Amino acid sequence: MNYTMLKGKIHRAVVKQADLNYVGSITVDTKLLEAAGILEYEMVQIVDVENGNRFETYTIAGEPGSGMICLNGAAARQVAVGDHVILMCYAQMTPEEAKEHHPKVVFVDDENKIARVTNYEKHGKLTEDFI
């Protein structure tokens, strides 16, 4: 039996654009994808912090260092520009792999620049000094 484990996460990124007429997906700054260990075209789950919407799409690599987070196609209806979103990617692992696994968690500032990268996910309240 395999487990589905959190592989990578970009926490509280700010939606910069929403393009309803694009074919689909989410465009993400390449630096953020790399820091979180998420590949271009990989499936991600997205949670909108402001409205609670939760949906899946795939990633498209955006310009490195741009801070771009753009929801495309139908996904653009799930968010508003300025909303905070959490992007999560999962991987299948054997029980042995799962026991040793630590996800890559990327915290960003309001410009979607990397503020901190950790290899753990723990319960707790976000504070300014945590990010």
From Swiss-Prot:
Pfam families: Asp_decarbox
Cofactor: pyruvate
Gene Ontology biological process: alanine biosynthetic process; pantothenate biosynthetic process
Subcellular location as annotated: Cytoplasm
Catalytic activity: L-aspartate + H(+) = beta-alanine + CO2
PTM annotation (Pyruvic acid (Ser)): residues: S25
UniProt PTM: Is synthesized initially as an inactive proenzyme, which is activated by self-cleavage at a specific serine bond to produce a beta-subunit with a hydroxyl group at its C-terminus and an alpha-subunit with a pyruvoyl group at its N-terminus.
Cellular component GO terms held in the UniProt record: cytosol
Molecular function in Gene Ontology: aspartate 1-decarboxylase activity
Keywords of the record: Autocatalytic cleavage, Cytoplasm, Decarboxylase, Lyase, Pantothenate biosynthesis, Pyruvate, Schiff base, Zymogen
Cofactor note: Binds 1 pyruvoyl group covalently per subunit.
InterPro entries: Asp_de-COase-like_dom_sf, Asp_decarbox
Binding residues for substrate: T57, G73, A74, A75
Active site: S25, Y58
SUPFAM superfamilies documented for this protein: ADC-like (SSF50692)
Pathway: Cofactor biosynthesis; (R)-pantothenate biosynthesis; beta-alanine from L-aspartate: step 1/1
Functional summary from the UniProt entry: Catalyzes the pyruvoyl-dependent decarboxylation of aspartate to produce beta-alanine.
Designated name of the protein: Aspartate 1-decarboxylase
Species: Agathobacter rectalis (strain ATCC 33656 / DSM 3377 / JCM 17463 / KCTC 5835 / VPI 0990)
Gene this chain is encoded by: panD
